[in-house]
């Protein structure tokens, strides 16, 4: 049975400023403490006095290791999706158990609309080879949904078809079509090494993902390289 400190979607999606965010974050903290057995035990072992937690800085944050060793859930509803973190062969991965996929979908859809507007205005192209080749990626789940919502026949995933993707980006840009290219870092770098773009109607969304694939770069160097390669002012 669910306990007190119930959180509703209206709480989460009505946040309009820092003060309100802090208020809801503290409410979420108390909800998790009351309903999430793993988190409650963690806080109790830290001897956290829940009633004295009055700011974000005082909230104990659960280490990522717990998502590898425990089932971290805050209700008893059936698990609808299990998202698994990326990792090299043999690594123990983290698991995100989702009991309400509709809430997850509403979250990223509203987030997209907040920053970019109507999804139907864009062709969504995805260059996510390392994610597309494994099971349980929340990123693939999200991008697949955005591709479908765009309702554009040109939208889609590209695995290793760089020549086809290059031609598509150039053609869509020349036609004045708004495009969002969502790509893993190393694949975006591979793409601009193959072709230097001057894109006027394309937004580049870099998802991260360089470790083990290429030499590590500082964030500023990476952004500068990608901006120059795609001919855009920001990533």
Predicted regions and their residues:
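Active-site glycine/GP-rich loop and adjacent strand/helix microenvironment
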Residues: 1-12, 16-38, 121-123, 130, ...
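Active-site diphosphate/adenylate-binding microenvironment
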Residues: 18, 34-84, 92-97, 104-120
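Internal, well-ordered alpha/beta segment that forms a basic, Gly-enriched binding/recognition surface
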Residues: 89, 104, 108-147
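Flexible domain-boundary/linker segments
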Residues: 42-45, 49, 102, 125, ...
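Short, charged/polar micro-motifs that form catalytic or ligand-binding hotspots
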Residues: 29, 94, 98, 129
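Low-complexity, intrinsically disordered/propeptide-like segments
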Residues: 49, 65, 142, 172-175
């Amino acid at each position: 049975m669910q306990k007190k400190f119930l959180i509703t979607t209206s709480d989460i999606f009505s946040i309009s400023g820092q003060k309100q965010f802090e208020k809801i974050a503290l409410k979420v903290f108390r909800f998790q403490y009351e309903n999430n057995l793993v988190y409650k035990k963690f806080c109790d072992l830290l001897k956290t006095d829940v009633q004295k937690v009055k700011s974000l800085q005082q909230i104990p944050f659960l280490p990522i290791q717990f998502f590898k060793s425990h089932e971290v859930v805050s209700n008893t509803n059936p698990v609808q999706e299990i998202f698994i973190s990326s990792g090299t062969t043999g690594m123990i991965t983290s698991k995100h158990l989702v009991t309400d996929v509709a809430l997850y979908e509403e979250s990223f859809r509203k987030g997209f609309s907040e920053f970019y507007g109507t999804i139907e205005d864009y062709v969504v192209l995805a260059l996510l080879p390392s994610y597309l080749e494994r099971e349980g990626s929340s990123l693939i789940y999200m991008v697949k949904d955005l591709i479908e919502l765009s309702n554009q026949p040109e939208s889609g995933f590209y695995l290793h078809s760089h020549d086809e993707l290059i031609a598509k980006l150039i053609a869509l840009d020349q036609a004045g079509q708004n495009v969002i290219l969502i790509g893993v870092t190393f694949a975006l770098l591979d793409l601009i090494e193959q072709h230097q773009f001057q894109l006027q109607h394309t937004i580049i969304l870099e998802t991260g993902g360089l470790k083990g694939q290429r030499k590590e770069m500082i964030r500023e160097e990476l952004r500068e390289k990608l901006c120059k390669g795609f001919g855009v002012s920001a990533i």
